[in-house]
Amino acid sequence: ARMRRVVAHVRGQLDGEEQAAFDRAHAAWLTFRDRHALFIAQSYARGPIRALIQAVTLESLTSAWTAELETQLGVPHD
């Protein structure tokens, strides 16, 4: 929810090519996040811990990206 609010705020400040560039960068980041979390989870043996590791990694990466957007692009914190 926090990331959606931050992304919406950022997109609202951009127009035209800037918004398109942000959308491309954000889409690439989402792909990286998902693939990285899967990679990390695959390093664990099959079993229930694997899904947990993937979820925790997704949450951690999302939190870090959201904080980066807030800091670098001047988004007000909640």
Residue ranges, per PLM feature:
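N-terminal alpha-helical modules
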Residues: A1-D78
